[in-house]
């Protein structure tokens, strides 16, 4: 996946979270869905998600769209749909923590991202299902 070079995003590096002393992923069972998504999301074409941020140059760096896509995909897969419940899970649930690490989005960030990119998620879900079918 090609990332735009102009815009600076808050860093998202799930592999680095595994190096932490308290790595949440270490406590998850092998084969957990979150590992599949952490491997899958960087391979998705998220260029349209990034494009919407390229025009805005003011303010602090936004969350990496890949983090928010991964977070929402996982939340939907496990039946968590409310942005407030997703944000709460990012504080307590090991699988959610494996995605967000120490940089946890609040409910408004999650909600705004979902609203702003709702039309793009149908393509992402289709792409994920295709890759999952290939993987078996």
Q: Which stretches of residues belong to each language-model region?
A:
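Detector for conserved single-position "signature" residues within domains
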Residues: 1-136
């Amino acid at each position: 996946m090609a990332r735009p070079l102009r815009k600076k995003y808050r860093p998202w590096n799930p592999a680095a979270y595994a190096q932490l002393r308290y790595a949440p992923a270490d406590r998850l069972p092998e084969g957990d869905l979150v590992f599949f998504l952490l491997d899958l999301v960087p391979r998705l074409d998220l260029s349209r998600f990034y494009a919407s941020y390229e025009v805005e140059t003011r303010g602090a760096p936004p969350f990496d769209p890949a983090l928010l896509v991964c977070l929402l995909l996982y939340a939907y897969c496990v039946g968590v749909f409310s942005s407030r419940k997703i944000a709460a899970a990012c504080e307590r649930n090991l699988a959610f923590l494996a995605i967000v690490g120490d940089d946890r989005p609040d409910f408004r960030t999650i909600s705004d991202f979902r609203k702003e990119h709702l039309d793009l998620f149908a393509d992402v879900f289709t792409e994920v299902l295709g890759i999952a079918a290939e993987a078996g």
